[in-house]
Amino acid sequence: MRSAFILALGLITASADALVTRGAIEACLSAAGVPIDIPGTADYERDVEPFNIRLPYIPTAIAQTQTTAHIQSAVQCAKKLNLKVSAKSGGHSYASFGFGGENGHLMVQLDRMIDVISYNDKTGIAHVEPGARLGHLATVLNDKYGRAISHGTCPGVGISGHFAHGGFGFSSHMHGLAVDSVVGVTVVLADGRIVEASATENADLFWGIKGAGSNFGIVAVWKLATFPAPKVLTRFGVTLNWKNKTSALKGIEAVEDYARWVAPREVNFRIGDYGAGNPGIEGLYYGTPEQWRAAFQPLLDTLPAGYVVNPTTSLNWIESVLSYSNFDHVDFITPQPVENFYAKSLTLKSIKGDAVKNFVDYYFDVSNKVKDRFWFYQLDVHGGKNSQVTKVTNAETAYPHRDKLWLIQFYDRYDNNQTYPETSFKFLDGWVNSVTKALPKSDWGMYINYADPRMDRDYATKVYYGENLARLQKLKAKFDPTDRFYYPQAVRPVK
């Protein structure tokens, strides 16, 4: 009885402390003129719902920022009251890191800041607010200026998390990662200062922002180099019909050889299977269907027999964004529908030898027997001789995977009205482990935009940032020594 009473008293005290903290932070925000989300309102209910409903967290308060000054004041209030701060742009983090990955943060909700502030038609540089989502930014740049940037395929993803950690999509082989378009930023630091960062100003901070940006501050303005929106693209697909392990092994190895040595910049593609047991190739080609067929024929000539080339579709830029969005529109200014899932990733220099054998064995022997929910894998061609991603070295930005040919996403989803079972984590864990055990540690990593929150902080930052981790730890100690922008897989400050 006594222990139960002490436990209950502790819970009451903790709850009271949380209320006091919430009252204090909301009072500070209000005094500074920062809009806040009030519990029970529609805004609060929208902003507190995570994309991955498996990982709900409750912030101490939500600052609904609408200006750079609001962001600055929010960080200053958090510093004053010794609260951790997390910035949420689109809210699409697989690990709910926009909430802080735990309860009790001050959440800076950025998605009321969605404007393209300015565009310079001489330089092609656009200044963009941090809460815009990819589809909205693509729509505005295309419709108003006839311009584009390289980015991922999910239109509801916020630009800030996407850009800050790389940003891969069906334009990356042609135009590089989303982060490669970043030429400057306006950042609110942990001490509340507002600074500019670029290749010539605060260059060390700029380096860290380009690949590990969530660790150092909140970007209030992204300055992006755009390119002319393409007028002719081709959506293509190939049904592979791999009926046995031998054909799958030969097929993946054929794709690897083509991707590494032959595939021109214009070919952006992946192998994917969406739980049906029949993988295919899908992608975008920057040019006409006839040009795609000529460019892709060397791969078709080496694939195992039985494949079927699907009809192609000619698209303009914004149609191509819509084509792979899985929605009927792309101009998202509110969150995407929620899901209930666990995901993992790999970045690989190669998937030949025992690595591909283990991948295929697991696919046929384990994965294809999982029939009670939706799962998928995507083997994206990330690097290769002609990939624009590899034209930048690992040392030039904080993004450390440019020497990797493959970016793989593994995704396991239950219905939203179900509970993701503890016993199901072993499905993807086992698949990833089957591959990595066959490779030296230097030949693989993981991608934080497909975050796996079950990894501890030190292991996660090692696989996310690889050879750049030590430099990032020193930058963290310089710009955020008290870990104000902490989340469970944030870089540690180490002097």
UniProtKB/Swiss-Prot annotation:
There is a cross-link at H92-C154 (6-(S-cysteinyl)-8alpha-(pros-histidyl)-FAD (His-Cys)). It is found in: Secreted. The keyword GTP-binding does not apply. GO terms for cellular component: extracellular region. It comes from the Eukaryota. Residues 55-229 form the FAD-binding PCMH-type domain. Its EC number is 1.1.3.-, 1.1.3.5. Pfam families: BBE, FAD_binding_4. Binds 1 FAD per subunit in a bicovalent manner. SUPFAM superfamilies: FAD-binding/transporter-associated domain-like. Residues 1-22 form the signal peptide. Optimum temperature is 50 degrees Celsius. The FAD cofactor is bound via a bicovalent 6-S-cysteinyl, 8alpha-N1-histidyl FAD linkage. Optimum pH is 5-7. It catalyses: beta-D-glucose + O2 = D-glucono-1,5-lactone + H2O2; D-galactose + O2 = D-galactono-1,5-lactone + H2O2; D-cellobiose + O2 = D-cellobiono-1,5-lactone + H2O2; beta-lactose + O2 = lactobiono-1,5-lactone + H2O2. Glycans are attached at N244, N417. Belongs to the oxygen-dependent FAD-linked oxidoreductase family. Catalyzes the selective oxidation of C1 hydroxyl moieties on mono-, oligo- and polysaccharides with concomitant reduction of molecular oxygen to hydrogen peroxide. This results in the formation of the corresponding lactones, which typically undergo spontaneous hydrolysis. Carbohydrate oxidase is able to oxidize a variety of substrates including D-glucose, D-galactose, D-xylose, D-maltose, D-cellobiose, and lactose. This is Carbohydrate oxidase.
